[in-house]
């Protein structure tokens, strides 16, 4: 029988993941900072999912960007439906901690968001981010349009050149299209660092500038 530690560096195969549940976790559907809904159809707005380590600090990075309509913490990219935080932390769901970013393309470009993403963490660390180790901390971009996907791949290649010049290794970010189902995290994780100003934030970038989105 596999122990929990077996999934710190390996995504569970089909049949190994926890079963999850049909019912979504309870959610207070109002953003603590801007009052916008966390869940909805978001007609006329664009969406993307970013994974860049612990979602507490990651969500704050994006809710501060002008033009972002709403953000939410959640789980994506794995197999377990409606997983809980403890289940995701076990490594047995296949999910990474992710942030749903809903934004107005007339107010902020996707390239600007990509630059924020790349510069806010170290995308070369594989199944960890700083001291946070496990598949749930892997770097990821889950795109909702083909144009986003192309832009994300191009930005990865451009940033790889800068990272290589600075002595970093290969980018390990998972870039996918279409985006997988985004499962909202428990209420306490939503806008966590606004509720807990002295809460943990392990997010740290490389200090290497990303050459895209400079004029956005």
Curated annotation (Swiss-Prot):
Its EC number is 1.8.4.11. It holds the Pfam family PMSR. The active site is at 54. Keywords: Oxidoreductase. One of its GO terms (biological process) is protein modification process. Gene3D superfamilies: Peptide methionine sulphoxide reductase MsrA. The keyword Translocase does not apply. GO terms for molecular function: L-methionine-(S)-S-oxide reductase activity; peptide-methionine (S)-S-oxide reductase activity. GO terms for cellular component: cytoplasm. InterPro entries: Met_Sox_Rdtase_MsrA_dom (IPR002569), Met_Sox_Rdtase_MsrA_sf (IPR036509), MsrA_MetSO_reductase (IPR050162). It catalyses: L-methionyl-[protein] + [thioredoxin]-disulfide + H2O = L-methionyl-(S)-S-oxide-[protein] + [thioredoxin]-dithiol; [thioredoxin]-disulfide + L-methionine + H2O = L-methionine (S)-S-oxide + [thioredoxin]-dithiol. Has an important function as a repair enzyme for proteins that have been inactivated by oxidation. Catalyzes the reversible oxidation-reduction of methionine sulfoxide in proteins to methionine. Belongs to the MsrA Met sulfoxide reductase family. This is Peptide methionine sulfoxide reductase MsrA. It comes from Xanthomonas oryzae pv. oryzae (strain PXO99A).
């Amino acid at each position: 029988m596999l122990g929990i530690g077996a999934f710190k560096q390996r995504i569970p195969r089909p049949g190994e993941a926890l079963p999850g549940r049909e019912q979504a976790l309870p959610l207070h559907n109002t953003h603590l900072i801007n009052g916008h809904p966390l869940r909805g159809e978001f007609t006329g707005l664009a969406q993307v999912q970013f994974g860049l380590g612990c979602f507490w600090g990651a969500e704050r990075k994006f809710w501060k960007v002008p033009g972002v309509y709403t953000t939410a913490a959640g789980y994506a990219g794995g197999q377990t439906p409606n997983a809980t935080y403890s289940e995701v932390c076990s490594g047995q769901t296949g999910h990474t901690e992710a942030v749903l970013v809903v934004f107005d393309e007339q107010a902020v470009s996707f390239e600007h968001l990509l630059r924020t993403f790349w510069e806010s963490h170290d995308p070369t660390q594989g199944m960890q981010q700083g001291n946070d180790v496990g598949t749930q901390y892997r770097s990821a971009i889950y795109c909702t349009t083909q144009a986003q996907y192309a832009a994300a791949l191009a930005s990865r290649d451009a940033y790889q050149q800068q990272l290589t010049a600075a002595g970093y290794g290969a980018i390990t970010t998972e870039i996918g299209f279409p985006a997988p189902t985004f499962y909202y995290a428990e209420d306490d994780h939503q806008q966590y660092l606004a509720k807990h100003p002295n809460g943990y934030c392990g997010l740290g970038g490389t200090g290497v500038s990303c050459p895209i989105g400079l004029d956005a």
